[in-house]
């Protein structure tokens, strides 16, 4: 959620600068994905795109009974009564469940408000469909969560038109997702010198240009 909101803040800055943000949902754009999509000026989806899932949930596993059967005891030293509130070794108290529910509700309300503001929808209407349900792109369009049916190229064309670009050869700059440790270990980055060299060069070019592009994963 934190990462989603950080990206959303950058999207707000882009929109505030006067640059339109056009969204192409692709196969799936649900939950946090829709949180971000709702920040766009115009949203394209395919009829069978999986989207929606507006809501928040938190779960945890309690293995207390299993530990008892195995004869394993968990001992802890903590600074406060609720420091281990989501520990798998004990159940939550009624008070703690209320605490967690309050936190979930707070994030949920932020989600609903974000969608209502971004889509210019009545908050109560958003709440009526913000029960975690998933939707197809077509269903989302009927509910006002998506603007039009279309693919990546439709979105690209619309973005060019919104930016006053009339040429058939629309200039597009793609940004990679970076290289993770998992990717390195799995062989995703087969040429590390090339990968890191390119990253360094890109960083230098961005520094010279005085701009910075956030990396979104």
What is each residue range found by the language model?
Residues 1-31, 42-46, 58-217:
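N-terminal organellar transit peptides
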Residues 36-41:
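Alpha-helix C-terminal capping segments
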Residues 48-56:
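Active-site loop architecture of trypsin-fold serine endopeptidases
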